[in-house]
């Protein structure tokens, strides 16, 4: 399998999980570095510059939430949270703090491997875009969107988006004015098929994060609108 030696940082206080993931991910071609707590994770992140972080929530010294917050201050690196079975609050909190996806413990290593592949592919390969913008720069009111460079500027100032946030925006602007259902968004952006029964609040949280970064008034959005009973749409205010 050709992966070009992407580097994964696995952060978990359980040594058995670290060893299993290090072995499995190394076998399929990734370079793996590990950390046993949040403080060590931040140190290793600065030293190793990984391409993706797998991050447990409950850890000593600094929990996964704290690590996620610190990483998001300086990086848009893909983050997958490991959360406890049935603990919906953990999942939502992690997403609100900037995680891109989550996997519920106990998990199948194959499931995590699939999520890693999907997240790296969708955040680092613009050719997978579902948009019809043909790589052009878009000016939408006070927003400038550079499709090729995957960058967004608001009133001339660059806004930091995670890879998944940009992919979500890219999908919405591909058919401006047309609503996308949450199921459509989950499939197009995250690669989740309907039979997976993924909590659709993953979409809601990412929409909320996008609004907080792009809208002039996030509580009364003009761009990313809710299509009641359906999902969300992007409205071109330049028209």
Curated annotation (Swiss-Prot):
Subcellular location: Plastid, Cyanelle
DNA-binding region ranges: 76-94, 135-236
Pfam families named in the record: Response_reg (PF00072), Trans_reg_C (PF00486)
SUPFAM superfamilies: CheY-like
Biological processes, Gene Ontology terms: regulation of DNA-templated transcription
Record-linked CDD domains: REC_OmpR (cd17574), trans_reg_C (cd00383)
Modification type 4-aspartylphosphate: residues: 56
Coiled coil start-end: none
GO MF, one example: phosphorelay response regulator activity
Domain Response regulatory: 7-120
Gene3D superfamilies per UniProt: 3.40.50.2300, 6.10.250.690, Winged helix-like DNA-binding domain superfamily/Winged helix DNA-binding domain
Top-level taxon in the UniProt lineage: Eukaryota
SMART domains recorded: REC, Trans_reg_C
Transmembrane portions of the chain: none
Entry GO CC: cyanelle; cytosol; protein-DNA complex
Alphabetic keyword roster: Cyanelle, DNA-binding, Phosphoprotein, Plastid, Transcription, Transcription regulation, Two-component regulatory system
Described function: Probable promoter-specific protein mediating the interaction between DNA and RNA polymerase.
Protein name, as recorded: Probable transcriptional regulator ycf27
Organism: Cyanophora paradoxa
